[in-house]
Amino acid sequence: MKTKLYFLTPLLLFALSACNSDDPSSSETDVPAAKERQDIPLTRSETQLADHTLDFSLALLRQASLQEAGKNMLVSPLGTAALLNLMANGAESHTADELYAVLSPSGVSAGELNDFFSKLNTWLPELDNTTSLAQAYSLWMDDQFTVHSGYTDVAQSVLGADVRQLDFQNTQSQQQLYDWCSEKTEGCIREIDCPLADAQLVMLHTLYFKGAWTDKFDPAQTRTETFRGNLREVAVPMMHDRQRAGYAATESFTAVSLPYGNEAYSMLLVLPAAGTDMAQAGRALADGAWKELTSRLYGAQVDLKLPKFTTEVEQPLNEVIAGLGAPTMFKPGADFSKLADGNMFVSKMFQKAKIEVSEEGTKAAAVTAAIMTMSAYE
C-alpha cells in the first residue's frame, strides 16, 4: 500500500516515512476574510533567483534524503538559503565562489542576492492576511570577538539582523539564544543543540508559518488508522475529506495541492509509487518530477486521507551543504575575511524544524544555525 508522503512547499520540504501521532493542540480563533492574492513584483534578476531557489530547494531535498534515508525528514530550503546568504556576505575567494554558485545563477551579484532575500522578508508576510509568516536573522558574538563593522552593517540594514554580544563562557548565555528562537517561532522551537564554549560567532535564521486550510477538514471525520511508513507501522489520527483540489499523477508520483487562506500558499502532497524509497524519490523530484507534477496540476474532486500529526526533526547540514557544492566553509582554511580577522570556519551547521498538521491547517517553524570557530590554520 502506498502510504509514504512528501509535503512540499516553497518554505518547507517534508518527507514522512513514519509520523508521530501526537495530537497538535488547536486553539484557533476567528480569522479575518482573506484579501485578494497579490504576487510579489520581481525584477528580471529576481525572477532568475526565484527559479534558482526552487532548484536549490529540490537539490536540498535530494541531498538530505540521501543522508536521512528511512527517517522522518523535515527541512526548510528558505531557512537554509537565507542563512547561507548571510554567511556568503562574509566570505571571500574560493569560499565565496562556492557559496554563490550554490545560491544564485551566474551573472547575479551579491547585492542583488541580498535585495532578493530582503524582498522576501518584506513581501512574504503580506501575501495573505489570514496566514502568518515571519523570518528573522541574528548574529551572536562572543564578547572577546570582533566582527567587521561593514559586515554587521549589511546584516542589520539589508537583512534586518539582530546583533548581540555575549560571554560565551557564561552558562546563562545559551538561554538567551533559546529565548530568541522561542520568541521568533512563537514557542514552536524552544531549544537548539548549539554549544558555545568553543565558538566565536553563531548565526541564526528563524522561519515561522501558520496557515488555515482554505477548505478545512471535519474533525468528526478524523479516526485512528494505521499509517505504513518505510520502516514501521504506526496508529495515527487520519483526517478524511472530499474536496476540490489541485491534482496530478504520473507513473512515479501522485500529487495533491491543498491551499491555505487566499491560496497564496499551499501544501503539495506527493505520494511516490510503491517500492520507492526516500532517496529515490528525492532524486526523482529534483531531476524533474516536481516540475512535471506542478505543471500537470488541475482542479478535481479528491478523496483525501491525511495524517494529523506533530513532528520535530534536527537535521545536520554540514555534509548536505558540502554535497551541494560548498564544502570549503566547513574546513580550517575557509576564507571569511570580510566577516572578521583570523581563520574562521563553520564547525557546525544544522536546522531544527517542527510541523503540526491538523483539521484547521498547518503550523511550522525552523531554526537554521551556523556555529563559527577560529582555527589554527595558517
Predicted features, each with a name:
Residues 70, 110-273, 295-376:
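Non-catalytic, conformational "gating/processing" segments within enzyme and secreted inhibitor domains
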Residues 93-99, 276-279, 313-315, 365:
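Extracytoplasmic/secreted cell-surface and envelope-processing proteins
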Residues 12-15, 24-27, 355:
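Disordered, low-complexity tails and leader-like regions
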Residues 6-7, 19-168:
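Detector for small/aliphatic-rich hydrophobic stretches
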Residues 99-103, 217-226, 279-288:
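Short Gly/aromatic-enriched secondary-structure transition segments
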Residues 1-17:
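Sec-dependent bacterial lipoprotein signal peptides
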Residues 3, 95, 368:
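Ser/Thr-centric signal marking residues that sit
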Residues 20-22, 145, 258, 277, ...:
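Soluble, non-membrane globular domain cores that form compact, hydrophobic packing
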